Amino acid sequence: MELDLGLSLSPHKSSKLGFNFDLNKHCAIEGAASCLGTEKLRFEATFGLGNVEENCYMPKQRLFALNGQPNEEDEDPLESESSIVYDDEEENSEVVGWPPVKTCMIKYGSYHHRHIRNHHHCPYHHRGRRITAMNNNISNPTTATVGSSSSSSISSRSSMYVKVKMDGVAIARKVDIKLFNSYESLTNSLITMFTEYEDCDREDTNYTFTFQGKEGDWLLRGDVTWKIFAESVHRISIIRDRPCAYTRCLF
């Protein structure tokens, strides 16, 4: 082991191997270094590796040279930007914001745009719950009220049936308000209808005519005009001072 590595510090053994130097002396260390350097040069000269280090450092020299000079193969930054803008103009001519607009919002925007564009060509203009038909052949626009409630105009309906109830009578009736033109005619017809088949008619009986309006409030006859009553009545109740039954049925 000591012979192979030559690490023995004994001068006797080193003289046998042909190395006459002492590792403890500085001059001996320099001599060994020069010897090793000579052997290295011989080895490189033998195998033709004299330019190995130069070849290894050549790419680094090229890199340093390229860092100081512009690369001829690189494109001009202005040309690259112009080509990018040109491609974007070909693909999509519209302005796209960031973040991108969702597909549902794009569809809604296109639909809203078409709806507004068609609205200007439509002869009907919507204003709240009223529709005004603009006709060039008619001097005055026609106005109609939109609504499915019973408070619509009585002239626009063919019939208007209202439920009627009288105190002491178990069965309610329905009458067409459009067949009457005043409170008196309606009251007389209702009293006659209820007392004709009921044994409840008395001369000293007083009747109170009440009705329920469109807002749900109960009103007396005469609180509003007949026209408003005919348009807003939902239910009628006739109260008797002396009913046949001792219970009063108001609904």
Curated annotation (Swiss-Prot):
Q: What is the lineage of its organism?
A: Eukaryota, Viridiplantae, Streptophyta, Embryophyta, Tracheophyta
Say which family it is in: Belongs to the Aux/IAA family.
InterPro entries on file = AUX/IAA_dom, AUX_IAA, PB1-like
Put simply, this protein is called: Auxin-responsive protein IAA29
Outline the extent of the PB1 domain: 159-246
Source organism of this protein record: Arabidopsis thaliana
Localization, UniProt: Nucleus
Q: What does this protein do?
A: Aux/IAA proteins are short-lived transcriptional factors that function as repressors of early auxin response genes at low auxin concentrations. Repression is thought to result from the interaction with auxin response factors (ARFs), proteins that bind to the auxin-responsive promoter element (AuxRE). Formation of heterodimers with ARF proteins may alter their ability to modulate early auxin response genes expression.
Give yes or no: UniProt keyword Transcription regulation: yes
- Domain note for this entry? The N-terminal half of the protein contains two conserved domains I and II. Domain I includes a slightly degenerated ERF-associated amphiphilic repression (EAR) motif which seems to be involved in the activity of transcriptional repression. Domain II is required for the correct degradation of the protein through the SCF-mediated ubiquitin-proteasome pathway. Interactions between Aux/IAA proteins and auxin response factors (ARFs) occur through their C-terminal dimerization domains III and IV.
